[in-house]
A protein has these predicted regions:
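N-terminal basic/disordered segments at the start of proteins
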Residues: 1-37
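Cap/lid and interdomain-hinge subdomains that line or gate substrate/regulatory clefts
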Residues: 2-9, 43, 105-233, 238
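Short, well-structured alpha-helical segments in soluble
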Residues: 57-70, 86-89, 248-258
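Periplasmic-binding protein-like
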Residues: 70-79, 98-100, 262-267
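Short, acidic/small-residue loops that bind anionic groups at enzyme active sites
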Residues: 88-115, 122-127, 134, 286-299
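Long, internal scaffold/assembly segments composed of regular secondary structure
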Residues: 220-313
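C-terminal catalytic subdomain
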Residues: 289-425
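Extended hydrophobic packing segments that form well-structured cores
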Residues: 372-499
Length: 499
């Protein structure tokens, strides 16, 4: 994927002047050796400058990691550490920063070999707060060389999302459909996140689409589509128009991203789109998303934002689905009740179907097929509703989440992990049966209670750990990062007297 950053973490050791500098240097070397042995050398850079309680050392280390192309930073306390210069480094570095610290290695060397980084990290946290400087501190931030290497590796997807957002432009084509308040998108919070937004009209897109009529690249894209769809290419006559639209959006990305490095899109697909363009855009949305350019439906700007975050963290294809409908009791009784899945058995109250008309990439659908958009075809001529890619989602672990601004421009988020069940939905669209523990309570006391839109970003594995840290780093209050609580862990609005 070319539309997400490559992260290079500069590792800078720091030392208190009353502790041996060599202790911090040797611990840094051991950490780097462990990292390279487990994960390779491409993601990190070992800064040769150890900061020993000196602002001049700090400036030299800062210039060194910048010169070496580092866009993320690990401040490694090899001993107690100098809280002024080490946090000044974090404050001056323009990118995501983490702190971790060295544990004592052996009982045989607790005289000159004792570093007291466990204590020093407390001072570092205090100084970071004084400077109002953000930093990622792992759950267990003090460890041996291998454990600190693992911490840095866990930091990389977090850093990738932060760096990506600081260089992101969301391109939208709207306005949102009438009678669709759910996709209200106050843009102040985007600027608070350093995300750029370019809002265009549907008419701008139509004009550009028409200018791409008879584009010489159309035939090549059609062949790509035929190859991807295979036996699912049931409406071949629509492919040239879809190819023309894909080229239109691709060119718009190229010519409009400006000084930003990464792009996410959100477009309209109703009510006038079908009749004016002559198709529905779902399949094209899915193809661009598979190429690393997430496209959210229905002018869902924060859906596009969430999909991009998910793409950065997972380095995989994402999708955007409605939290859509319940699972019928007869389906549950015949296909799900009493059966053991990846994460065990499920109750009916844990289940829902996630659906969208046909925007999920072919690689995430068990068996895809080109179709008419069934809902639109109920009131429009069938010939203008072609263009959805339909099929049941690939089963396996999943994460549903959303980063959203409230109407008064406050950020909040939710995350829930579960699985997509290997059970046929017997329905239409890009669709799957989702199993999320205690989903009924999560639905009522998070999604409804906090007025979330019905769109959720979908990842095809468990990424809650990284998402939670990204949202904290972005400044979402921890009380507004919701998740599906376990039984007997009540939500603030939950009635404790209900059986």
């Amino acid at each position: 994927m070319k539309n997400i950053p490559e992260v290079k973490v500069g590792i800078v050791a720091v030392s208190r002047n009353c502790f041996p500098e060599l202790l911090a240097v040797n611990r840094r070397k051991a950490l780097v050796e462990q990292y390279i042995a487990k994960y390779g050398e491409n993601d990190i850079y070992e800064c040769p400058i150890c900061i020993v309680e000196s602002e001049l050392h700090m400036a030299r280390a800062l210039n060194n990691v910048i010169k070496e192309g580092c866009n993320a930073l690990c401040v490694f306390l090899g001993n107690f550490g100098p809280e002024i210069s080490e946090t000044m480094l974090a404050d001056c570095f323009d990118g995501p920063v983490m702190f971790c610290a060295a544990a004592e290695e052996t009982q045989e060397d607790l005289l000159d070999g004792r570093g007291d980084a466990y204590c020093g990290l407390l001072n570092a946290s205090y100084a970071l707060n004084l400077r109002k400087t953000k930093a990622y501190i792992p759950e267990n931030p003090v460890g041996d060389a291998e454990e600190c290497a693992d911490m840095i590796h866990s930091f990389i997807p977090i850093a990738r999302a932060i760096v990506g957002l600081h260089n992101l432009k969301i391109i939208s084509f709207g306005p949102r459909p009438s009678n669709f308040l759910a996709c209200n998108a106050p843009i102040q919070a985007l600027y608070d996140l350093h995300v750029e937004i370019e809002e265009n009209s549907e008419l701008d897109l139509l004009e550009s689409f028409q200018k791409h009529n008879c584009d010489q690249r159309i035939d090549g894209v059609v062949e790509e589509m035929k190859s991807e769809l295979g036996v699912g290419n049931t409406i071949p006559d629509i492919l040239p128009k879809l190819a023309q639209y894909e080229i239109t959006l691709s060119d718009w990305i190229r010519t409009h991203k400006g000084n930003r490095k990464y792009v996410s899109l959100t477009t309209k697909c109703w009510p006038a789109f079908q009749t004016m363009f002559g198709f529905v855009p779902c399949y094209v949305n899915s193809r661009l998303t598979a190429k690393g350019y997430p496209v959210a439906c229905e002018v869902d700007i924060y859906g596009a934002l969430s999909e991009f975050v998910g793409t950065c963290i997972s380095e995989d294809v994402v999708t955007l689905l409605d939290i859509n409908n319940t699972v019928p009791k007869d389906m549950f009784n015949q296909q799900i009740r009493g059966k053991t899945f990846v994460e065990g058995e499920y109750a009916l109250s844990d289940l829902f179907m996630g659906f969208h008309c046909g925007n999920t990439s072919a690689c995430k659908i068990s068996s895809c097929k080109m179709c008419n958009q069934r809902i639109m075809a109920r009131f429009l001529p069938p010939e203008v509703t072609k263009g959805t890619i339909e099929g049941d989602l690939v089963p396996g672990k999943t994460t549903i989440f959303r980063l959203q601004s409230t109407s008064d421009s406050k950020l909040r988020a939710y995350i829930a992990q579960g699985e997509i069940l290997p059970v046929a939905t017997r329905s239409y669209g890009s669709i799957g049966i989702f199993a999320i523990r205690e989903m009924n309570r999560f639905y009522r006391h998070v999604l409804i209670e906090k007025n979330y839109p019905h769109h959720a970003a979908i990842l095809f594995d468990h990424y809650g750990k990284s998402l939670y840290e990204v949202f904290k780093y972005l400044g979402v209050p921890v009380g507004d990062i919701d998740y599906n609580r376990k039984r007997n862990n009540y939500y603030p609005t939950e009635n404790p007297f209900i059986d």
